[in-house]
UniProtKB/Swiss-Prot annotation:
Note: The reaction proceeds by a bi uni uni bi ping pong mechanism.
Catalysis: reaction(s): (R)-pantoate + beta-alanine + ATP = (R)-pantothenate + AMP + diphosphate + H(+)
Record keywords, A-Z: ATP-binding, Cytoplasm, Ligase, Nucleotide-binding, Pantothenate biosynthesis
Domain of life: Bacteria
InterPro entries: Cyt_trans-like (IPR004821), Pantoate_ligase (IPR003721), Pantoate_ligase_C (IPR042176), Rossmann-like_a/b/a_fold (IPR014729)
Official protein name in the record: Pantothenate synthetase
Role according to the record: Catalyzes the condensation of pantoate with beta-alanine in an ATP-dependent reaction via a pantoyl-adenylate intermediate.
Subcellular localization, as worded in the UniProt entry: Cytoplasm
Gene Ontology biological-process entries: pantothenate biosynthetic process
Amino acid sequence: MDIINDIATVQSRCLQARQAGQRIAFVPTMGYLHEGHLSLMREGRKRGDLLVASIFVNPTQFGPKEDLASYPRDLERDAELVREVGVDILFHPTPATMYPNGYKTYVHVEGLTKTLCGESRPGHFRGVTTVVCKLFNIVQPDIALFGRKDFQQLAVLRRMAADLNLPVEVVGLPTVREKDGLAMSSRNVFLSAEERKQALALVDALRQARVAAHHGEHHARRLVGLVRERIGREPDAQIDYIKICDGDTLEGVDRIDANSVLLMAVRIGQTRLIDNNYILEEV
C-alpha cells in the first residue's frame, strides 16, 4: 500500500489504472477508522481492481463551535487498518493541499441540505459536497462507498453526482453497529462510560418506533413523540432533531410507508450522535 500526500501523484496512479482497464473503488473518510469504515473498504475491494481510500479531516464542514481541533486523529493506526483490508492507495492530503491560498470555489446542493443536519449545522453540507467533489475529480472512481448512518449525506452526494454528471456510482451500505446496537462512529470515543450507556437510548427508541409501526401505528407525529419521550428520559440527552422523512426527498411525512426513514441527532453530554432506520424495516 502506498500513502500519498500530493494530488498529482494520486491522479497519475489512478490514470494509469483506468488506462489499464481497471475499475477504481473509492472510500473517503476523515480517519480514526472503525469497523464501519473497514466494511466499506472490504466491499470496495470486492467491487474494484484498484482500491483507494482517503483520510482528510475536512475543515470546511465544521462550524466555528464544532470539534475540528479535537476530532480524533491517528494516521499510524489507520494506515495499519487499511493495509490489512487491502487498500492500494491511501490519500492523506493536508488542508493546504486541498484548499490552497486563494481558494474560492464551493459546491452547494439546494433543498436536501436545508433540513435535518443542514438546519442545525449551517454550511456543513457545503463543506462535505465541496471536498467530496474535489476527491471525485482527483481519484475519478467508478464507484464510491458510504455508510447509511450518514443518511442525509448519502442523499446529498447522490444528488450532487447526478446533477453534475459525475461518472461515479455512489453506493450506500447498511449502518455497522456495536454488539449492543450503537451505531459505530469515530465520535463514540468521546463518550464517558455513563454517557455510553445513555447513548443506547437512541437504539432503543429506534427499536420501539419500528415495533409500534409494525403493530399498525403509521402516524409519523405519534412515532416521533414515542422516540422523543424515550430519549428524554436520559439526563444528559439533548435532542437536536427527530424526524420521519421520505427516504428520497428527505421531506417530512404525515403517514409512514416503506420508504419512510426515522432520522435523529442527539447530543449526549458534549458528543453529537446521529442514527436512522427505515421505519418499516424488519425489527
